[in-house]
Amino acid sequence: LFIAHDLAVVRHFSQRVAVMYLGKIIEIGDRASIYTRPRHPYTHALLSAVPEVSVAGESAGPRERIRLAGDVPSPISPPSGCRFRTRCWKAQDRCAAEEPPLIRVSGNREGHLTACHFPEDPTTEARAEDIVLDPALAALEEGGH
């Protein structure tokens, strides 16, 4: 178990990733699926803050940063329904009325679950070459020692 707020670091240490908001898991899946096809708006916002670097080590260009409006609600007294709804640009009445279950959304890979009534469309196709691993971690994943 590796807990961090820095998704740029999490990418290099984890095979499965769970994204939490106010103490609840709102998205969980394998690393490639979360980083290349995030479905929860909060996951999109978090990933928009991760700097992009090209293979040559130069900036890959500007990424549209999602800035969340409003204050973070109290975890002691979270809002009704979806805990992220007070800061979500997709929130509707249903989000306040019922908490979204953590389910597999159409288009997600097996094991990629999202808790959102109005999930984001996948923004990219999952490609293994998009994930650059530390060589030691890559060797472990390939069965090396």
Language model features with spans:
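Charged, flexible cofactor/metal-binding loops and thiol motifs
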Residues: 30-144
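A short, surface-exposed alpha-helical micro-motif characterized by mixed small hydrophobic
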Residues: 10-12
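H-loop/switch region of ABC-family ATPase nucleotide-binding domains
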Residues: 4-5
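Short, glycine/charged-rich "phosphate-handling" switch motifs in NTP-dependent
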Residues: 16, 28
